[in-house]
Structure formats: C-alpha cells, structure tokens
Amino acid sequence: MKIKTKRLIVERVHRQNVIELTPLLKYQSLFQQAGLVTVGKVDLVTLGILAQTECVLQIRERGEQGLLGLIILLHSYDKTGAILPKQYEVGYLLLPRKQHQGYMTEALSAVCDQLNRSQITVTAEVRSDNASSIGVLSRCNFIRITINPGMIELWKRQDMG
C-alpha cells in the first residue's frame, strides 16, 4: 500500500526497512497513547514483528521525505479469537513537533478512503481525555459507538460509499 496526498506519502513498512522508524523510538509515550504497548518499551524488534503480522504504515512528507509518524492497522478478532475479515482497528502516532498541523487527519483520511473502496471497516479505541485523537477521528468521519469502563471510547468510521 502506497498512498500520496497533497503533502504526504503513506506507505507500508516491511520488516527489512523497520530501522527507518528509529527516530520514533525516543517517544515511547506516543506508543502507549496509541495503545500499541501497555507496559515496557517498543523497540525495533517489536516494530519488526508488527510489520510482519499487521499493517504498519509510515507517514512521510512528500518533499523532504522526513518521517512524521505511523498508522498501524491491527486485525480485529471475534470472541473466539478468529480474525474478523475486512475489519481493522487503527492506531496512530505523530512526532510531537508535527502535531496540530493536520498531518494525521490528512494521512488517516487517505488511508481510510482507500480501505473503504475495498469495503473494509475501520474502528478505533481512544481514551475519553485524548481530545487530539478524538478530533482526528471526528474529522476523518468516525463516529463514537460506545464508552467502555476505564474511559475508553470505541469509534467506527462511517461508510462513505
């Protein structure tokens, strides 16, 4: 998957080029906020495993090719542990100096539009106090479905087709 927008290139990270994500490792709190880790640290081995088993997308600026962040599409599972076809949960993170400039809205919207063309459902879980992520999800046509115990909200992207 490779998507180009006005300002960005969003493309899949493969295990062999996961080292390009090294600049993100110093922002461990972003991985926690994105729900990708609850304890411990994310390292290149962890990212390599994610790149092999899930869909890890890097976000880069078109002109400079500078790494801005990640979008990760995680398989969704039913109650028996079986993978739900055509359904992903999204997690994302952006370098702090690049936040609040519309980059994540632009990237996530483009990715979701591409997935929508294949009738793929995208959901997200976000803490109720994470106003920035809630704003991104709202701007990308997600709607709040439910609030779970622990202030975790479940959002689902509306079908745009």
Each predicted region: which residue ranges?
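Conserved GNAT-fold acetyl-CoA-binding loop/helix
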Residues: 28-48
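Acyl-donor (CoA/ACP) binding surface of acyl/acetyltransferases
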Residues: 1-32, 56-161
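PAS/PAS-like sensory domains
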Residues: 51-55
